[in-house]
Swiss-Prot record:
The keyword NADP does not apply. ATP binds at residue 283. This is Cysteine--tRNA ligase. It holds the Pfam family DALR_2.
Amino acid sequence: MTLRFYDTASATIKDFVPVHPGEARLYYCGATVQGAPHIGHVRSALVFDVLARWLRFRGLEVTTVRNVTDIDDKILVNSRASYEQDYSGDHAREPWWALAYRFEGVFGQAYAALGIDRPTYEPRATGHVPEMHALIQELIDAGHAYPATDGSGDVYFDVRSWPRYGELTRQRVEDMQDAPDADPRGKRDPRDFALWKGRKEDEPLSASWDSPWGRGRPGWHLECSAMAGKYLGAHFDIHGGGLDLRFPHHENELAQSTAAGREFANFWLHNGLVTYEGEKMSKSIGNTVSPQDMLREARPLAVRYYLGQAHYRSVLDYRPTSLQEATAAVERVEAVLVAARAAGLGLDRDTQDVPAEFVAVMDDDLNVPRALAVLHETVRAANSALATGDHDAARPLVAAVAGMSDVLGLLQLMDLEGAGAGGAEHRALDVLVQDLLAQRAAARTARDWASADRIRDQLAAAGVVVKDGAQGSAWSVES
């Protein structure tokens, strides 16, 4: 069966034909590192992690790009807020770039804990300002962008100059809301959006760059177009992100890229949002859930299973029992592999043996719910064969379970050495250590260095060594 995906732009499921034969090039929007992640951020990253894994399984050479937006209005606002809330006098104001780097690490720790692969490239917006300047100049030269005439230093995309504007979300310009990213003064049309934002007097000098239009910083939409073009070329296969990014972010990306003469993405894939008991997650309501919250309640294996179990285009609803149910389901898969090892059946963690039905449903718009149904069906058959001692029948079934678990990113998080008390003891210890690491991460986020050091020392006294890295903290037992 041919790979097929739902393309938001055409609102149809289309056959996937790579731009470059034998390759798949994928760009998906990463974090704006203004604060700690919630489960919606992690779900999106996991969706595109599974997509990349499946494309590789199908024999394609996959290049992935997940950007980091490390300069943004909200980052500057939160940096100012962190200063205003610091009454101790012990610390100077946290610079915007330090806040961004700190939360980039928190995101990385969440990704790593859930086995989400590092992308081929993970570019920061601040490292690609020259490419953004070049794209702006192309648009000005083509008559699709203009510097504001009010002396602000802003540069805007002229939506009226591009007849295709609105094609991604199938809207007419007349029906769109005004762009919220800048004052309407200096614009030709209220819906024109900022490509470059002139520096304001109350903003740090370090948060701006010299440009032909004056000192300032790039607009959010421009950042992604410039970085996608640099790493994937003018024409690539898939652009992805959360459903909430379709408009205005992805609409504006598409417009400025195609207006500059780039074909841009063949497919636009959008994952559904996450709700809490049917309601939108909101800080004001107080119903947001963080990856750390989930990892305190369940193993990374169960959290990954939960976040990936719904179809990527569906809403994923979180309930207090969600992780308990996910734990029960995925540990049935893990248990059959542990039982197979105990019975003397070898297990290759890199096996690629999967049933034809699994391949068919994954090829059909990445239908993970149906793929999980095939997985659990195979688990039941393998358990029956093991129970009767029919190892010849069990062997291919166990290999299929391992292969499907590997493709879905579950196998790497399983404790297949745990046939007996040792594995259970390790899991129990991991729960305790992860809780302490979460407390330590919270202390570091609050810049409470004394508490963070005290937790590290407590762990060290118990023989647990903590290593901090760019992707978060890892632990091991001192030998």
